Amino acid sequence: ESQAIKNPASKVTKAASLLNAKNRLCMSGTPLQNNTFDIFAQMNFLNPGLLGNMEFFRNEFATPIDKFGEQEQKEHLRKLLFPFILRRTKEQVAKDLPDKTETILFCEMEKEQRKVYEAYRNSYREKILGTIDQQGIGKSQLTILQGLMKLRQICDSPAILNEDEKYPNHSIKLDELAREIEENIGDHKALIFSQFLGMLALIKKKLIEDGIPFEYFDGSTSAPDREKAIQNFQNNDECRVFLISLKAGGVGLNLTAADYVYIVDPWWNPAVEQQA
């Protein structure tokens, strides 16, 4: 599973490259997820030196492709990789599989939630503009990301903010999700992904209140408990919902019993959502 070696600088990648083997094979659902360096790390494990060293690859491929979208270099890289990739698509292996239907459910915040959102937005707007004036846009990125993260959390529920002042749970998303589950989880099963553990905790609480059996795991769940949860969801007709943290459950999972997937909060990288 080559998800583990996509970062060429990581210890895992370096350790894997030291393994002595006659044959090497990488398996991945998304070989290219973050940037072109994902490909470099995997190919460097399979055929060390084929794409040159890191500096050569950066100058020759990564910068021209990722930064400037140069078609010629994309095509050159594609031709280099082509003989080493065995690719199967859904069309080839599962013709009977229905198309994925995506629906974006827009939720309008109610008064209390909107009030908290506006207060944080105004506060961070002043803070960000002040930081940009003092340090320039380049050095203000952390403050901007901080502000965006807070607003994203409030969109889920102000209750999940990690602040000294605790806010009550006003969440239009949770209300909508509960309505969706009630309507759709009759003869169906659903996966629910969120990047925020606080939001997953609120959903857990709601499912318990509504008497809906579910399974759960996040990054802290041990491998045996994770496997137990997977088997129960797959094989137990009573268990209709699986709550999963987006980063922990986005890869290396086959949950074929589910036919609904809810992504509660969008991730920065669309490829992570696609994987989920």
Region spans (language model):
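Residue-level signature of catalytic and energy-coupling elements of molecular machines
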Residues: 2, 28, 81, 110, ...
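Catalytic acidic motif of RecA-like/P-loop NTPases
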Residues: 3-6, 30-31, 198, 262, ...
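RecA-like P-loop NTPase motor core
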Residues: 39, 79-126
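Conserved Helicase C-terminal RecA-like lobe
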Residues: 95-118, 132-253, 257
